[in-house]
Amino acid sequence: MFLPFYILDGGFFHYAGDFNSQQISFYRYMNGFIKGMGYPDGLTSVNGHSLPTNTFSWATDLGSGAMNAYSFYLYGSPFFWFSLIFPQHWLPYLMVPLLVLKFAVAGGGAYKYLQRYVQNQNYAVLGACLYAFSGFSVYNVFFNHFVDVVALFPWMLWALDEAIYNKRHGLFAFWVAVNLLNNYFFFAGQVLFLVIYFVCKVSTGECKLTLKLFGHLAVESILGVAMGCLLIWPAFLSLLQNPRTVDLSSGWGFLTYSHVQQYLAILVSWIMPPDSPYMTSVWSEGIIKWTSMSAYLPLCSLAGAMAYWRAQKGDSMKRIVATCAIFALVPVLNSAFYMLNSSYYARWYYMPVLILCAMTIKALEDPEIDLDAPAKGIGWLMLATVVFAIVPVLDSSTGEWSLGVLKNPGQYAAVLGFGLGGLLVYRFICQKWRGKKVFVQRLLAAVLAFSCMFGIVHIGIGKFGQWHTDSDLVEQDTNALKLKEDLPEGDWRVDTYKTHDNLGLWLDKSCLQYFGSTAAPSILSFYPALGVKRDVRSEPDITNYALRGLLSVKYLITTPENQSDFENEADSGWEYYDTLDGYVLYENTNYVPMGFTYDYYVTEETYEDSITTTRSNLLMRALVLSDEDVETYGKYLTELPEENLYDLYYETYVSDCNDRRANACSEFQMTNSGFSAEINLDRDNLVFFAVPYDDGFTAYVNGQEQEVIEVDEGLMAVLCPAGYSVIDFVYEADGLKLSKTVTLIAIPVFVLYVGYFKWSDKKKKRH
């Protein structure tokens, strides 16, 4: 599936979208960060107490705590930690081998789970391949770290079955911990699914709920969560500040989707192979792209599962799938798999997919179950989608009629062709070899061949659909590594113009252009207050010149191809610097070093009443303080006169930059745990740092702890006395001490717990 592209790309496999912009960059960057290859240590001890190091990533947006920024992506992933045995510069070339490993682990876990439900273990192998190469798995290569979840979940479900049916101790707790560490966001959905799974098992009488079993599962659940909570408590405290949660005033939005097409897309996603993540074949409304909406099983679709459904009554698997279908169709229930996240996703479908695999292989193994009729039914449903290609459409603007609502006819034809072709092969094999020893081998071979061919086509559609923009990705990324060595020395930020995403991660520099969902939460309040959209990326427009001075941007980086566009679009304040390593550099003539003081402040109310488009200019003139901080720190500054709230032009911005530069830190150094600075003041004053506020920061001024003040609706300041001061900001994720303590206590408890039952089992065998 990956080999043709691996060869084509010379080992540096690149796909499209998130995979190119985030996954390659994150894996390579964090490999070096964990190994301490970035910024130097900062303040390491105060009054004999050691301080944390290697906790803060400057290259992540405006700077973010590394653990919270990457725990959603890779920080707890065993696959990422395994990759640390390789050198950092190998990582872009290891993305495919790591994906292969993840698919193998997914298949192994699915096999362990499924073998309980069939007599012939070859059917478990078949089911494992159906799961590993499901439409969900192939689709989510685009996101890469979602495949980690797909790989590890079956092991937890297998461990739950082992606890229920074989009374094994320790396995479930272990896999709960692994899955929680791997991804806290997906784990929330896994907990809900396990509850549905267990309730359905009990309600059908497939397992008997006793006090002993309940206690067993409760203890192991708590123990597993305790061992795996290392990342979740800091992440939870960080997420509390994140606005991407459910709107509790949604009303009907709780119960129904706003577009009929959303329902059709959900239903079709269970029977048809998936579209490319960023390219829909049919749908023009609803939230479809990037949602991971696919529950398709390779070759057979739902034919086997539906055959099982028709043949069984009162079965737990049917109840699980039926419950999941209801959850998929009701918005608030769907979002329950993601802690009531307000954005629509279908990224939990991999769990019912595993149950569908179990239903499929049970139907295939049972000679009494009719396989052909459901296959025909699924085929007719697939054919019914042809109506999208022939339905007459009236263009309201031209008054002309046309046929079809297809957005991408070529992709639709490929998806439909694979869907119908797979069913035809499935029916042929079932009719020719069912009941013979070679049946399962023939079907397995067909599933693998189909998965390989569809995977190549699916990835190819996504890859070459963006080839016009991504063909120079490898060149830009490798050139950035050269540029990193050739940039002038110093600790400042950069900006980019029409380059590939996340260039700052390759330069190990804080960059205003950043693509990532989980940067410091205060960024998500700072930028919107300036009228800059911040959802999953930061990309302030180049015309916002004042923001570059405020955030200490010294250089802007673009490509020769985009140089003229930049010069036409940019305002004054940029001066050509040099052409280096395939990039063109411009220097900010209004650069202000990090860490400076103000003479004036404005209240948050005044700031929020000001004109949004000139707020960046205002921030170069005055510090924004909350009413509470005005009472405490207002005496060190003067409230900005009203007449100075409006003369916010480029010329006055240049003057304000000169004033800030005249009162800036004489030294500023970025460290792997925050930053340190030196400043000489003629009076007590607040020193401002354009660094995202985070509860995890502790400030030290001349070795004494000082309060960190949140200013400008998301940045930081600290009070310093008159004269020379040394300032240190040290970061440790808020809540980490508590979660670390719980984990360190839980691990030896787990060892004793497992050891006790091992000893008890041996004792029983002797007697």
Question: What residue spans do the PLM features occupy?
Answer:
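Extracytoplasmic/lumenal acceptor-recognition loop(s) of multi-pass membrane glycoenzymes
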Residues: 64, 68-72, 450-470, 483-553, ...
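Membrane-embedded helix bundles of polyisoprenyl
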Residues: 98-99, 103-116, 122-164, 168-203, ...
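Transmembrane alpha-helical segments
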Residues: 106-113, 152-164, 192-200, 302-308, ...
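Active-site-proximal, structured, solvent-exposed surfaces of multi-pass membrane proteins
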Residues: 636-767
